Amino acid sequence: MGFLKGKKGLIVGVANNKSIAYGIAQSCFNQGATLAFTYLNESLEKRVRPIAQELNSPYVYELDVSKEEHFKSLYNSVKKDLGSLDFIVHSVAFAPKEALEGSLLETSKSAFNTAMEISVYSLIELTNTLKPLLNNGASVLTLSYLGSTKYMAHYNVMGLAKAALESAVRYLAVDLGKHHIRVNALSAGPIRTLASSGIADFRMILKWNEINAPLRKNVSLEEVGNAGMYLLSSLSSGVSGEVHFVDAGYHVMGMGAVEEKDNKATLLWDLHKEQ
């Protein structure tokens, strides 16, 4: 028996079969969930519909989170097709490319507002819109990153947005807890996705994480997907307001990993460069 058998969930923000939202959707489907999906525009619809078909879902809706009328339409469509929901996955984040270059000091007010509206307020509006459809014990999950609390090169205004997103998770967890609805964030390590492709030097970031994480590896899409499924299922029924890390332990590190060489501690990163 699957952990999500008979449960219905909405996946918001899947971009392709490399995205974290896809990994979560696949794991939920494997555990018996019925899924619905959203797409941003016609261009992304062509990517999302094959994913929905792969996961046996006829439910695909347009949702541009910057358009209020789309939320109303989404509510009506989900209510008509599914009646209610047991979980929501919010995988929406955006900042203009120029805001991920240079320094935070150079961030324009327009870029700042865009990042906050799309990456943070969308979770609040989505949850509030669909709250009447959420069943007792439902779960809401959003995606964050370590750049919310630590400096990450080239992350800039998205670090601020993720910090605000994690704060929103805590406040929403309290607001919705009285209705027995849980809200959590999943903070994954670096993975090659459409979103990460916009971050400069991402290949170096992947290698740095692999060398310095306690598990000496990068996480897989399957590992992140399974963790997401856990947070959406009754397996985590006592968990809310949490930021759950799936990053091979990288978030616990205070400095680069070291190893003994010639009777002295040497950075693994330096040893790797010598090879």
From Swiss-Prot:
The site annotation (Involved in acyl-ACP binding) covers 203
Q: Which reaction does it catalyse?
A: a 2,3-saturated acyl-[ACP] + NAD(+) = a (2E)-enoyl-[ACP] + NADH + H(+)
Q: Where does NAD(+) bind?
A: 13, 19-20, 64-65, 92, 162, 191-195
Keyword annotations of the record: Fatty acid biosynthesis, Fatty acid metabolism, Lipid biosynthesis, Lipid metabolism, NAD, Oxidoreductase
| SUPFAM superfamilies linked | NAD(P)-binding Rossmann-fold domains
> Has UniProt tagged this entry with the keyword Lipoprotein?
no
Query: Which GO biological-process labels does this protein carry?
Result: fatty acid elongation
Q: Which domain of life is it from?
A: Bacteria
Q: Which Enzyme Commission number(s) are on file for it?
A: 1.3.1.9
**Does the record carry NAD as a key word?**
yes
The UniProt entry, under Gene3D superfamilies, shows:
Enoyl acyl carrier protein reductase, NAD(P)-binding Rossmann-like Domain
Q: Which residues form the active site?
A: 145, 155
Q: Part of which pathway? A: Lipid metabolism; fatty acid biosynthesis
Which positions does UniProt annotate for substrate binding?
95
Question: Any idea which GO molecular function terms this record carries?
Answer: enoyl-[acyl-carrier-protein] reductase (NADH) activity; identical protein binding
What family classification does the UniProt entry report for this protein? Answer: Belongs to the short-chain dehydrogenases/reductases (SDR) family. FabI subfamily.
Q: How does it assemble?
A: Homotetramer.
Which PANTHER family does the annotation name? ENOYL-[ACYL-CARRIER-PROTEIN] REDUCTASE (PTHR43159), ENOYL-[ACYL-CARRIER-PROTEIN] REDUCTASE [NADH], CHLOROPLASTIC (PTHR43159:SF2)
Function field? Catalyzes the reduction of a carbon-carbon double bond in an enoyl moiety that is covalently linked to an acyl carrier protein (ACP). Involved in the elongation cycle of fatty acid which are used in the lipid metabolism.
Query: What is the official name of this protein in its record?
Result: Enoyl-[acyl-carrier-protein] reductase [NADH] FabI
Organism, scientific name: Helicobacter pylori (strain ATCC 700392 / 26695) (Campylobacter pylori)
